[in-house]
Amino acid sequence: MKTNIINTWHSFVNIPNVVVPAIEKEIRRMENGACSSFSDNDNGSLSEESENEDSLFRSNSYRRRGPSQREHYLPGTMALFNVNNSSNKDQDPKEKKKKKKEKKSKADDKKESKKDPEKKKKKEKEKEKKKEEKPKEKKEEEKKEVVVIDPSGNMYYNWLFCITLPVMYNWTMIIARACFDELQSDYLEYWLIFDYVSDVVYLADMFVRTRTGYLEQGLLVKDELKLIEKYKANLQFKLDVLSVIPTDLLYFKFGWNYPEIRLNRLLRISRMFEFFQRTETRTNYPNIFRISNLVMYIVIIIHWNACVYYSISKAIGFGNDTWVYPDVNDPEFGRLARKYVYSLYWSTLTLTTIGETPPPVLDSEYVFVVVDFLIGVLIFATIVGNIGSMISNMNAARAEFQSRVDAIKQYMNFRNVSKDMEKRVIKWFDYLWTNKKTVDEREVLRYLPDKLRAEIAINVHLDTLKKVRIFADCEAGLLVELVLKLQPQVYSPGDYICKKGDIGREMYIIKEGKLAVVADDGITQFVVLSDGSYFGEISILNIKGSKAGNRRTANIKSIGYSDLFCLSKDDLMEALTEYPDAKTMLEEKGRQILMKDGLLDINIANLGSDPKDLEEKVTRMEGSVDLLQTRFARILAEYESMQQKLKQRLTKVEKFLKPLIETEFSALEEPGGESEPTESLQG
């Protein structure tokens, strides 16, 4: 082991040079009382003494030295710690081991590099490969993550539209090609292309189903194995497998004129129904979509019935009687278009129960016509019922609105209201209906949870409320509370929103329309307020020292039809009870506004609390006390009823147990009664 000589300047004169060997060994020697390798002699004597002490330490034949001898080596230990420039106790044994390993690895690398430079190059290459493999592994892990389709998203809905097209194609064309031979033979190449494109879409749909997530405990499942297992456990998986069985191979046996071998493709109809259901919930015109959907179903049924009629006519023989399709050798009835249109016409007349068709002749024809009439009756009933309900739903809002108008008309006639006032009322109702303002927002939104209702109100009204000066810097929670309390109001031309001297119980925000600040004569206009303007915010705060009090200071009149948002004083104060800091801030803002306008009496504002405020607080306290009293009375009544029920139960238990106890006591009083129970127990 190499030792280094370090010149140190120490307070001890006898230590000009210090030899630093292995530090841990020296510490152990000093703890055991052995001589340290540090001494006052030169290097030769130091090494000799250390060798002697090593031999003594190994043979365990030395004795521990006393404290006087240990003091002799104290300067050496001090120098040792000064050389390290840190406390050995602060170093963790783990860190020491790590440093030793690093030193060993570096020493080994140096030795190997000197011996074999090729090995060094190999190791460097291996390290580079590992570095390159790490990003590759990360990329592979990212690739393994399955892309899951959200069933409520647009991507899934668009895919449903894509799969619906081949389903509708198969449901309409397979039966037509099977019944009309010319349709299959003349356009065979096109049909094969469409068929196999639809088969590819069917296969892709099976893959999409394995990547379509589902909700489990409110969370979208993205595990690939779970998605596949759920799809396989579903009945639709079996139907999907049956729908893609390659029955087209039977073409090689029967020929190309048998497209009915592809009837298994019709089993994928559930995807079409799913697409229609989702479209009905997404569209803004659900009633129109329902009617068009119903018409489509009826057309498909008529189409299928026409194809079956033509195939029955072909089986019986064209032109054999008056009921079947005429002879195809006739040029007029030999064209493909005439064949299909004639069959479709016959099917429509039969299924709509019009019945202006030639009567059947054969028994099979009679059976087919009877079945058609039964189907037609069901179709007719379905049409009448569905369309009737749709029309009633479409007109429900109008009927309800009209009933309100009729009720008000009857009331005005009963009270002999003037014709001018009646015209104004009717015009106001017409404006509401034409501008679609008859919807009661609270009634529509009452089925939604509070969170969703609040979010809708925030999206609709929050920007409008922030325009008001006093609410500009309020807390978000207070603004949400106030947004939920805004009430829409509509004023017709010439209506006064407020007049000078009226008590201010509401503030108003103009959503749409124009209002005019007019003189007492109602004609002279001072200012015109437009969209986004507001007024009455100071009066509902009821600020102490206001020269106007809580009364209106101007006449405000609607020029045309105006839509306003109204916030009442009671609603504001109810919201501010939960936000006392916001209340003080609003009052301070109101005072500043009044001071700018010169409408604040500072002397009154600096006085103590207003007795009116105290009265309001007292009334509120009385109201809360009344509520507590009613709750206490209700709880007391419940307690009394429960107590009465318990008494009744106890009396029933007493009645039941009393004869049993009497019989037991009578048995004990009789001679030998004590032995009878024991005997009975033993028996």
UniProtKB/Swiss-Prot annotation:
Residues 34-144 are annotated as: Disordered. SUPFAM superfamilies: cAMP-binding domain-like, Voltage-gated potassium channels. Belongs to the cyclic nucleotide-gated cation channel (TC 1.A.1.5) family. CNGA1 subfamily. 3',5'-cyclic AMP binds at R552, T553. InterPro entries: CLZ_dom (IPR032406), CNG_cation_channel (IPR050866), cNMP-bd_CS (IPR018488), cNMP-bd_dom (IPR000595), cNMP-bd_dom_sf (IPR018490), Ion_trans_dom (IPR005821), RmlC-like_jellyroll (IPR014710). Residues 476-596 are annotated as: Cyclic nucleotide-binding domain. One of its GO terms (molecular function) is protein-containing complex binding. Rod cells in the retina. It catalyses: Ca(2+)(in) = Ca(2+)(out); Na(+)(in) = Na(+)(out); K(+)(in) = K(+)(out); NH4(+)(in) = NH4(+)(out). The record marks F380, V384 as: Central gate. It is found in: Cell membrane. This is Cyclic nucleotide-gated channel alpha-1. It holds the Pfam family Ion_trans. Gene3D superfamilies: 1.10.287.70, 1.20.5.170, Helix hairpin bin, Jelly Rolls. Residues 286-394 are annotated as: Ion conduction pathway.
